[in-house]
A protein has these predicted regions:
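A contiguous loop/helix-start segment that scaffolds small-molecule binding in enzyme catalytic cores
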Residues: 154, 158-224
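Glycine-rich, flexible N-terminal cofactor/catalytic loop recognition
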Residues: 1-57
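Glycine/small-residue-rich loop that forms an oxyanion/phosphate-binding "nest" at active or ligand-binding sites
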Residues: 56, 64-113
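Class I SAM-dependent methyltransferase SAM-binding "motif I" and its flanking Rossmann-like core
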Residues: 94-151
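Loop/turn-to-beta-strand initiation segments
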Residues: 3-4, 73-78, 154
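Conserved helicase motor
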Residues: 54-61, 134-136
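Short active-site oxyanion
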Residues: 25-31, 103-107, 154-155
Length: 224
């Protein structure tokens, strides 16, 4: 029986790619990629020529069974996403779950993810935190924010740049205008930036300065 490797890829700077990740991607029989065009650029940079197959949120329900069967047949497979660690707000959970259910060894390499550097750079308490990722856009969003209003741990969210100010305004309604928070964007890229302050101050900043790039919001938990 083969093995499934979950391989993180850089969220920005290609120098964040590990030697081990490169070696694994060169050795496996098949690479499952969220977007073969995006991953193709990465693989070409590191001279990785192995076969790629598309594996994303639209088709993963259909491809999981065939992938599991190939691993059962002795092939080694690597799972990558466009950036970061597969399964963290990206496709990956389904194939990992099915491999576990079928007794297939799953090995996840340590590596890049956007929320950890954003959390550390925020300056907010990080001994305990909760990762919320992307909140629902419509149904359930307000319910979830209401449930988090009493959360004591630091909270971490992903958001798109064009919805950032609206999201911060919603946070103000549920967490209070004076709640400390930070917004990190373009982690590990040329224009990386972290802005810290109260939710109101962040709204003012990003209303005046249109945000671009991938966004991580870190919000302090409620004080005792």
């Amino acid at each position: 029986m083969g093995k499934l490797y979950v391989v993180p890829t850089p969220v920005g700077n290609l120098e964040d790619m590990t030697f081990r990740a490169i070696r694994i991607l060169k050795e496996v029989d098949l690479i499952l990629a969220e977007d073969t065009r995006t991953s193709g650029i990465l693989l070409k940079h590191f001279e990785i020529k192995n076969v790629m197959q598309s594996h994303h949120k639209v088709n993963e329900h259909k491809t999981v069974e065939s992938v599991v069967n190939r691993i059962k047949g002795g092939e080694t497979v690597a799972l990558i996403s466009d950036a970061g660690t597969p399964g963290i707000s990206d496709p990956g959970f389904l194939v990992v779950r099915e491999c576990v259910r079928n007794g297939i060894e799953v090995q996840c390499l340590p590596g890049a993810t956007a929320f950890v550097p954003a959390l550390v750079a925020s300056g907010l308490p990080n001994e305990k935190f909760c990762f919320e990722g992307f909140l629902p856009q419509k149904k359930g969003r307000m319910t979830r924010l209401k449930a988090l209003a009493g959360e004591r741990r630091t909270m971490v969210f992903y958001e798109s740049p064009h919805r950032l100010v609206k999201a911060l305004a919603q946070f103000t309604e549920h967490f209070g205008a004076g709640r400390q928070a930070s917004v990190s964007r373009e982690i590990s890229k040329v224009h990386e930036e972290t802005v810290r302050g109260t939710l109101t101050e962040l709204i003012e900043h990003f209303t005046a300065n249109e945000p671009r790039g991938e966004i991580v919001i870190v919000v302090a938990g409620i004080d005792d």
